[in-house]
């Protein structure tokens, strides 16, 4: 059981580092944030299934688990609920690039930007990758389009 507790602690610690990076560090990193746009939340069903599976594990092995393991599994459920239902993904537009999916892309690496149906911004990169940015509202779409230079 000790190895399970160590792995759970390590996973929770890594998630807390990620949450700190996501909420505080990305705003300050790589220059000033010129535009911050909230995106559609995805993966809520996955997090719900994950939480239910952990709940089933707790229910099935309640008598065999130590109290520390129970607390760590409960913390894992709370973190997955935070990640899926409370935290909002963001598109951070900076001076020389942008953060999408917590990864920094430079504007010089963009080949083409298109707008698809349902407020989906399609960013084609020069390396052949395609980023699908699911914008939340029409107002967000207009702000991003104006940031990239308007309709052409």
Swiss-Prot record:
Keywords carried by this UniProt record: Cell inner membrane, Cell membrane, Membrane, Transmembrane, Transmembrane helix
The name this protein goes by in its record: UPF0266 membrane protein PM0830
Primary site of residence: membrane
Localisation per UniProt entry: Cell inner membrane
Cystine bridges: none
InterPro entries: DUF986
This protein's GO CC annotations: plasma membrane
Transmembrane segments: 1-21, 45-65, 66-86
One Pfam family in the UniProt entry: DUF986
Family that this chain belongs to: Belongs to the UPF0266 family.
Membrane topology: Multi-pass membrane protein
């Amino acid at each position: 059981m000790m190895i399970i507790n160590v792995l759970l602690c390590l996973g929770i610690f890594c998630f807390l580092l990620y949450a700190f990076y996501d909420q505080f560090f990305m705003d300050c990193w790589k220059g000033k944030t010129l535009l911050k746009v909230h995106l559609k939340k995805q993966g809520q069903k996955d997090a719900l299934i994950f939480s239910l599976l952990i709940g089933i594990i707790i229910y099935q092995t309640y008598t065999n688990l130590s109290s520390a393991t129970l607390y760590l599994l409960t913390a894992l459920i709370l973190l997955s609920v935070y990640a899926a239902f409370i935290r909002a993904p963001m598109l951070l537009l900076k001076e020389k690039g942008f953060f999408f999916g917590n990864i920094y892309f430079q504007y010089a690496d963009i080949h083409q930007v298109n707008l698809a149906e349902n407020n989906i911004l399609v960013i084609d990169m020069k390396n052949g990758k395609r980023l699908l940015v699911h914008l939340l509202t029409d107002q967000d779409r207009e702000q991003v389009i104006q940031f990239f230079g308007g309709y052409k």
